[in-house]
Amino acid sequence: MGDLPGSTGGGSGPAAAGNASGNASSAGNTGLGVAGTTGVDRPPSPARLSHTSEKHPKVTLTELNMLRRHRELCDVVLNVGGRKIFAHRVILSACSSYFCAMFTGELEESRQTEVTIRDIDENAMELLIDFCYTAHIIVEESNVQTLLPAACLLQLVEIQDICCEFLKRQLDPTNCLGIRAFADTHSCRELLRIADKFTQHNFQEVMESEEFLLLPVGQLVDIICSDELNVRSEEQVFNAVMSWLKYNVAERRQHLAQVLQHVRLPLLSPKFLVGTVGSDLLVRSDEACRDLVDEAKNYLLLPQERPLMQGPRTRPRKPTRRGEVLFAVGGWCSGDAIASVERFDPQTNDWKMVAPMSKRRCGVGVAVLNDLLYAVGGHDGQSYLNSIERYDPQTNQWSCDVAPTTSCRTSVGVAVLDGFLYAVGGQDGVQCLNHVERYDPKENKWSKVAPMTTRRLGVAVAVLGGFLYAIGGSDGQCPLNTVERYDPRQNKWVAVSPMSTRRKHLGCAVFNNYIYAVGGRDDCMELSSAERYNPLTNTWSPIVAMTSRRSGVGLAVVNGQLYAVGGFDGSAYLKTIEVYDPETNQWRLCGCMNYRRLGGGVGVMRAPQTENYMWCENSLKQHNNPPS
C-alpha cells in the first residue's frame, strides 16, 4: 500500500520500525499514524480513503429519469408535433450541444419554459430524450429513418454512429442506393463511403434494382464514373445506362451524352461498340454521343496512337481483376514455319486459337509493350525477316504498320525496358549478330545502341533491376554460357557471371527477382536442366530439371507461375507445357497447345477487358462510317 500515513518515505525495515516504536508515547501516536520519527515535531496528517462509485452515475440517471417521468423539478417542456415532453435543461444541455446552445445563450428559448422543436419526428425525439436519461436506445428498421435525422439535428454523435452502424448491416443490392442517398442528405460521411463501396462492389446486382432505375442523373454519374466499379466488362455499364435511360426516355434523353461520357467506350469490344452502341437509335440521334463512339473507334483502330489518347475513358476500372494470359506465337512445326497464334488462360487451362500473323515466323522474338504484342523478325521458311507485326487483343487483329528493324533477324532476343522494345543479336542469314537496336513506339523508329561484346544467335534476354541481360546463345561456332548486361544509362554492356551450362535456344524469364534459364541445347544434345541467376550475389545456382528436354522452348511467368512452353526434345516437336513450383522445386505437366512449336515466341498480357474477346471476324473498318 506504499508508505504509512505520516512517514517520510525515507525509512524501511526493522530500523525504521524501531524508531517508530520508540517515539510513539511522546508523540501521542494513536496507532494510525507515525510522528516524530526524525526528532522534529510535525502536525499529524489525517487518514484518507479514496473511493469512486461505479453505481452513482447509473443511480443518479435512474433517479433523474424518475423525476422526469413524474414531472418533478422539470424546468422545460418540449413541444414536438402534438406531444409534450417534460425534461430538465441541465440534462439536455449536458447531452446535446444543440440544447446547450439553446439554453445557455441569448436565444429566446433560454427564457422560455416551453420550447417548440420543428422538423423532427415526435417518436424519434422521445427516444432521444429517453437516451439522455437512460443511456439506452433501440435502433430498428421502423425508426432509423426518423432517428438519424433527429440525432443529427440534436448533435447526438453517438446515436448518429449507432444508426449508421445499423444501416451498414442492412445494406443489400436492393436498398444500398437509398441508404447512400439518405447518408448523403444527412452528411453521414462514413455511411456514405460504405454505401458507395457496397454499390461499386455489387454493381452487377444493383443495376437490376428498381432503386437504380429511379436514380437522379447526378447520382447515376457519381456511380458510373468510379474507377472502383466492379464489372466483368464495360458492356455492363453501357447496358445499365441504357436501362436507366429507357425507364423514362422523354425526360432523360437530354442527359444521354452527359451520362455516356462516363462509360468507357474505348474499352468495349469492337463488335459491341459497332453492333450495339453505334447502332442504338438514341445514340445515333445525338451528335455528342456519336462523337464519343467515334473517339472509341479511333482508339481501337489506331493502337500506335494510344499513348497520346489516354484519359479517363481509356483507363480500365480497378476491380476488373483481369488475370494474365499467355500467347504462343509462330514457330516451327511439321517441317515448316507457321503463322498460327494461340492463347492460354491458366484459369480455365484452355488453349484457344486467335488471329494468325500475316507471315509465317520461326525464331521470332516476342514481347509486350503498351498492352500490345509484338512479333519481331524470324524466318518464314525461305527468307530471313526484318518485318514486325503487332497484335491487339481487344480487336483480335494483327497490324503491319510497325517500322522494320535495320537488320533481318531470326533467333533474336526481344525485351522491353523503359518503354522501348529491344532487339538483341540473332542471325541475318550471313552472320551471327551482336547488333542491338531499340524501338520507340511514339516515333515508330528503330535506333541502334551499343553492340554486345559477343555475337549471339539463339540468345535469351531478360530485364531485371533496370538492366537488359543477354544470356547464352551461340556465337556461330558453339553454344555459350556467358552472360552480359546492358545499362541504358551508360549505353554499355558488361559481363556478369556465366551460367554453369552452355545453352543456345534456351528459355529465359524473370521470376521472384531471379533470372531463370531453362533447356536449350549444348554441344551435344537438347537439355532439360535449369538454373537461376541472383543479381545480388552475381551467382547462378541449379534448380530441378524439367520433365522433358526442350530446345527452342518458350519461358514466361503467368499469374505468378513459371511456364515452359513447347520446344524440341531431340526426336519430336513438343506441344506440352509444364509449370514450375519454386516452393517444392518441382516441374509438372499441365496440358498441351493446339500446335507443336519449336522456336516460337511467348508473351504475357492481361486478359482482354471484354468478355466476348473472341469476337467475330467482321472488321471494324467496314463499319467505321459516322452514323447518319
Swiss-Prot record:
Q: Which Pfam families match?
A: BACK, BTB, Kelch_1
Report each Kelch repeat as a residue range.
Answer: 325-371, 373-419, 420-466, 468-513, 515-560, 561-607
Function, in words: Probable substrate-specific adapter of an E3 ubiquitin-protein ligase complex which mediates the ubiquitination and subsequent proteasomal degradation of target proteins. May have a role in synapse differentiation and growth.
Which gene underlies this protein? Answer: dbo
Q: List the disulfide bonds.
A: none
Asked if the Swiss-Prot or TrEMBL record annotates the protein with the keyword Membrane, the reply is no
Q: Which UniProt keywords apply?
A: Actin-binding, Kelch repeat, Repeat, Ubl conjugation pathway
State the Gene3D superfamilies in the record.
Answer: 1.25.40.420, Kelch-type beta propeller (2.120.10.80), Potassium Channel Kv1.1, Chain A (3.30.710.10)
Annotated region Disordered: the residues are 1-56
Could you confirm whether the keyword Repeat appears in this record?
yes
Source species of the chain: Drosophila pseudoobscura pseudoobscura (Fruit fly)
* Molecular function in Gene Ontology: actin binding
Name this polypeptide is given: Kelch-like protein diablo
Q: Name one GO biological process term.
A: negative regulation of synaptic assembly at neuromuscular junction
Biased-composition ranges for Low complexity?
14-29
